[in-house]
Amino acid sequence: TGVAGTRLYFVDCYIDGTTDFIFGPSTALFENCEIRSKTNSYVTAASTPKDIAVGYVFKNCRLTADPGVDKVYLGRPWRPYAATVFINCEMGKHIRPEGWHNWGNAENEKTARYAEYGSTGEGSPTADRVKWAKQLTKKEATLYDDLSYIYKMCSDWKSAK
């Protein structure tokens, strides 16, 4: 998804792939998209720079899968400080109960910035989510309604307001 400092906005899109099919260091908002997993693997592999607060934001998206796909993680950190958040997303039964993976490195659990709010669907229960990922409060989730908040740290972003 580009290079660090890149800002992207995907709306009403269909995106599918196999392993880490949404990856990189950019700040990207995915809104009202269908995100379809074609194999048992990982949806995201963010490599968000430490000094960028927001990486991938999925709002009001549907996470679906091909038939037979039943073990998919929301993400794993390509680099320390990976940032990915899912807000009000419908998660299919293919999403693993733990949600997130540390890419085989426990140190990533100290730096990865993973969060959810308002997830629905068979893959949404949070009781078995990894303890190092966050469940946002309504107030925290509301911050992501503001494009200035999402993109303010990217290159020359200036709000139109």
Predicted regions and their residues:
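Sequence-level preference for short, compositionally simple segments enriched
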Residues: 1-161
